[in-house]
Amino acid sequence: MSIKVILTDIEGTTSAVSFVFDVLFPYAAKHLPDFVRQNAQRADVAEQLDAVRRDSNEPQADVERVVEILLAWIAEDRKATPLKALQGMVWEQGYQAGQLKGHVYPDAVEALQRWHQAGYQLFVYSSGSIQAQKLIFGCSEAGDLTPLFSGYFDTTSGPKREPQSYTNIQQAIGVEPQEILFLSDIVQELDAAQSAGLQTCGLAREGGELEGHVTVDSFTGIEPEAF
């Protein structure tokens, strides 16, 4: 059965890990406190602040305490859904102001465009919020790449190292598991996808091997028809 869908990770796969850790995270950490203070009454922001209180078991936390919790989560790289949502709102302001441009490797841009033209459906699955995913690709150094994608998945579909998450995504897309090729630089994510029946390809941009998976060092080496 041939590949119909290509599902890709972002960090370390389409985009440099350094962009996320050296550019996006520091930008969010710097601007998040004032953003939360200034927008705490906004419905979409208030909803996420309540989620922070719930997740931290501090239902009475005031805005300043919530800011403290968020900064602690950023420091420990916690994959908390409300943090990801709020970071996405801060990044959106940064992209709109022209202070941020999404990094996407040129080899990934070229391959994604080629696969889209060849009729493959392209989807993203990242621990960053769907909003943040759309910003990286929508305001990228290569322009607006969002027309290439059919959809986006984040941690609301489940953690990336659990097979059930990939089953959830496969069922949402509506194809057979073996018709999906999943791309990632993390072997535990590839293992989880493989356990759910997906085809896998590992990105080792610094070289090396992702054990148990076809491994390439750039998108140039990926041929979906070979899976």
Swiss-Prot record:
It catalyses: 5-methylsulfanyl-2,3-dioxopentyl phosphate + H2O = 1,2-dihydroxy-5-(methylsulfanyl)pent-1-en-3-one + phosphate. Its EC number is 3.1.3.77. Keywords: Amino-acid biosynthesis, Hydrolase, Magnesium, Metal-binding, Methionine biosynthesis. Monomer. Belongs to the HAD-like hydrolase superfamily. MasA/MtnC family. Bifunctional enzyme that catalyzes the enolization of 2,3-diketo-5-methylthiopentyl-1-phosphate (DK-MTP-1-P) into the intermediate 2-hydroxy-3-keto-5-methylthiopentenyl-1-phosphate (HK-MTPenyl-1-P), which is then dephosphorylated to form the acireductone 1,2-dihydroxy-3-keto-5-methylthiopentene (DHK-MTPene). This is Enolase-phosphatase E1. It comes from Pseudomonas fluorescens (strain Pf0-1).
